[in-house]
């Protein structure tokens, strides 16, 4: 009886060590990759965002934004709109709530509004830490065009874009995706990312 019990233990221990190897070999042979779940659309290939040199911050029109590092060293949540009406205001509120929920990771993320709207005083009062880029119009348009995708134009799409700390556009969240889902993706991204 002791021999049978010992044999069962040896067989069981062997299976514990061999089973993962067999599973991995089968996954490799049949090119099977378990699906991952993210709510946003991964941008393939990644697009390098080049920020025009003459952009001015809406906070202080006499002072230009430091564009050399605008989308570097931090993750950027970018929202692009023609005019900031109800949908825009709701999305900006959602982005602020997402940002605040990051707790210790707040300094790693910045929010940027790219807009052609000149009347941004109300937005600036509501969201003083939001970076608002709205002039000169030619440079704002050049910047917004870089976010265009083959299936839509960035201006008017009401999408949220994620730019990594190396200025690469990497994810797009359509206007149909809820803020909770965006937050889940970003929390996971910040958890596993060393950048920013």
Regions found by a protein language model. Give the residues of each.
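Hydrophobic membrane-insertion alpha-helices, especially the h-region
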Residues: 7-28
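Structural microenvironment flanking redox-active thiols in thiol-disulfide oxidoreductases
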Residues: 90-129
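Structural motif
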Residues: 80-83, 114-117, 135-137
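Thiol-/selenol-based redox modules, centered on thioredoxin-like
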Residues: 156-196
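Short active-site neighborhood of thiol/selenol oxidoreductases, capturing the structured segment around
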Residues: 67-96
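N-terminal "domain-start" segment that seeds a small globular fold
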Residues: 22, 30-69, 90
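Short, internal strand/loop/helix patches
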Residues: 112, 123-158, 163
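Short, surface-exposed patches at the edges or C-terminal ends of soluble domains, predominantly
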Residues: 60-64, 96, 101, 146-147, ...
